[in-house]
A protein has these predicted regions:
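Gly/Ala-rich beta-loop-alpha elbow adjacent to hydrolase catalytic centers
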Residues: 83, 87, 92
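Extended catalytic-interface subdomain
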Residues: 324-326
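Conserved pre-ATP/AMP-binding loop-to-beta segment of ANL
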Residues: 78-82
Length: 515
């Protein structure tokens, strides 16, 4: 089968907050993209047989000490290159031009004036773009021509057509650049001649081949949490190795209400997946007893999952492989990324909470995908819309939604409250408009009045965000009537909660989950 990773786009990451967004925008046009460290050598790049290179933006000035740099031989490699913001500055510098800090940066929405459409700007109708720069080009290199300028006279787009080098001062990957998708499309297909073969169907075929080759005649254990990612992994493994794939759902006591029963029914009855359910709640909760630190809770849950899998696998026969639903954003947030600029935000149970010595060979078939791509794969595999469109659910389950100590009483309170929350979102027809919604039990009690009695009960936070891949998220503007219904029904139905608050924090600065 043709390698989907060849003839794609390699993105050198200079620390931009938008680097992953560039990767997503390229993939949305069915072209494979991969993020690499800026130190990647030309030989290493050529070995991947890319069709083009994109140089990302970044927070540095190119003249700063220790500013990120790259192998400038790439410029003369013959590969089409698109430099964005900091990438434009690097191309300018190494082509003999000049970049300066004038003290007059441009940040936010801006207008540009197009002088020469050329191939890159062909079909571009809107002049609205998104700028985020302090430095600017003050001397255009020989052989380059300016295609567009900002209203302040700053070079906005330029090109060296002979070498297929192109650059923008603005960010075409950001939605605020209204014709950014068209600009990227021109670069991918009219300049770099990329082939749109990064599709869900091709991805499935490639992964099935890889899994079959890797596993051979062996058997695979697939952990299912009830969320979209693990469900898609279970379906993909079932397609690859059939009954030799053992989907295991471990009830760690931290699932949503009725989660285990619903998950088993959907996979077994709907797809014929070989699935087993095990109640391990007593073991998990005893390990978590008294622990309040969120990182330690994640590690405990991750470790216990592997130990439980190991024991369960031995009971199921000779199983040497473990499949996980690790996604690309999981790896990025855990600091296991291509750029040295990454910082650990929080460990994910799939990538940071595992024991050093594992008794399994790990399979992570979705680790290159963003969440929206996972849903497309799920659709291609024949999963129902109700499964595919379920909101993301973390592997540690409610363990990261109970702030502070985890007890059975607190779990029961959160399960019941969250069930009511989801029911109302469905009733009001807004569930599918939200990327992720959930409840969080706070270790704070507040005074209230019910009837003629004073109450002193738990505070519950509810959260709902919109997003496309989980990398960034905005809080969902919940209709006031829906908020009122949620609060009223929870407070009146769930014993132990007397106050509900709504979290209106975006990501960044917050993360989607509280822990």
């Amino acid at each position: 089968m043709k390698d989907l990773h060849k003839n794609g786009v390699l993105i050198l990451d200079f620390g931009s907050q938008y680097t992953q967004l560039i990767a997503r925008r390229v993939r949305e046009q069915n072209v494979y993209s991969e993020i690499l460290s800026p130190e990647t050598s030309l030989d290493a790049i050529l070995s991947k047989q890319p069709a083009a290179i994109i140089l990302s933006g970044g927070p540095s000035s190119i003249y700063e000490k220790n500013a990120p740099n790259f192998d400038y031989n790439i410029i003369d490699s013959g590969l089409p290159i698109l430099g964005i913001c900091y990438g434009l500055h690097l191309l300018t510098h190494y082509s003999g031009g000049q970049v300066s800090s004038t003290g007059e940066g441009e940040y936010g929405s801006a207008e540009i004036e197009i002088h020469i459409k050329g191939t890159l700007l062909q079909g571009v109708r809107s002049s609205k773009v998104w700028m985020s720069h302090g430095d600017q080009v003050t001397k255009v290199p020989d052989g380059w021509e300016v295609l567009a300028s900002s209203t302040n006279g700053v070079v906005a787009t330029m090109a060296d057509k002979k070498r297929s080098l192109l650059a923008t001062q603005f960010h075409p990957e950001v939605h605020h650049t209204l014709d950014g998708e068209k600009i990227l499309s021109n670069f991918l297909f009219k300049i770099a001649n990329c082939q749109p073969n990064w599709t869900a169907g091709n991805f499935i075929n490639e992964q099935v081949e890889k899994i079959q080759e890797f596993v051979g005649k062996g058997s695979v254990l697939t952990g299912v949490s009830g969320g979209v990612d693990s469900t898609v992994v279970a379906a993909l493994l079932h397609k690859a190795v059939g009954k030799r794939s053992h989907a295991v759902i471990i009830d760690h006591g931290l699932m949503r209400k009725n989660e285990v029963m619903e998950c088993v029914s959907a996979l077994k009855d709907g797809l014929g997946v070989n699935i087993h359910a095990f109640d391990e709640s007593t073991t998990f909760l005893s390990k978590l007893e008294g622990e309040v630190d969120p990182e330690k809770k994640r590690k405990i849950i991750g470790n216990q999952f592997i130990f439980s899998f190991d024991r369960i696998a031995k009971g199921l026969g000779d199983i040497e492989f473990l499949a996980q639903g690790t996604l690309y954003p999981d790896i990025i947030e855990s600091g296991v990324s291509k750029s040295n600029t990454a910082h650990v935000i929080k460990s994910h149970h799939n990538v940071g909470g595992l024991p050093d010595e594992m008794n399994f060979k790990l399979i992570e078939p979705l680790k290159e995908l963003f969440k929206d791509e996972v849903r497309k794969v799920g659709q291609e595999l024949g999963l129902s819309d109700s499964l595919i469109n379920r909101h993301p659910f973390p592997g540690p389950g409610l363990g990261v939604r109970i702030i502070g100590e985890i007890t059975q009483d607190r779990i029961s309170i959160l399960q019941e409250a969250d069930k009511i929350y989801m029911e109302i979102l469905y009733e009001d027809g807004i569930y599918d408009s939200i990327w992720q919604a959930f409840s969080v039990l706070i270790p704070v009690k507040t005074v209230g009045v019910m009837g003629d009695q004073r109450t002193y009960e738990n505070l519950l936070a509810i959260r709902a965000v919109t997003s496309t891949d989980g990398m960034t998220a905005d809080w969902f503007e919940m209709p006031p009537k829906t908020l009122s219904k949620i609060s009223s029904r929870i407070v009146n139905s769930v014993r132990g909660v007397n106050r509900v608050v709504y979290d209106i924090t975006s990501k960044p600065p917050g993360t989607i989950e509280w822990e």
